């Protein structure tokens, strides 16, 4: 079991974020996470955001998330050059995760809690047909590479039998470039 975590935030900041429908804060309320209640304050109900507010929040969230994806891609290329293919697959998984998060944040102001690329891809496909064609599943090689990428988050670090070839990592990088 995970140890409890404490987040200290003043009520005004919390309510401002809640009012703006920031996913982290709305999830706290939606999931019924226990908050200290001294009975002096009430939680704000989120208001309907204007188009400008939605655009500003989407831009801010994108600008925080997308650069991480680009950084992870950069390190995946470095790992490829250095022959550290499993590390490259891990970095590439992280890049994909951040790219999918960026898409969700822009379209619905929400970041899923999942690290599972199949789940993230499934959520994002509805926004663009091109997302559905990033990872092809026509050949055994394409299916195998996608499977390697999906497993990289855990197995690249903990499974001694997890192996990625230069050819596989190169192919995965080419596909993720399309997502970028």
Language model regions located:
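Catalytic core of pol beta-like nucleotidyltransferases
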Residues: 2-82, 86-91, 98-180
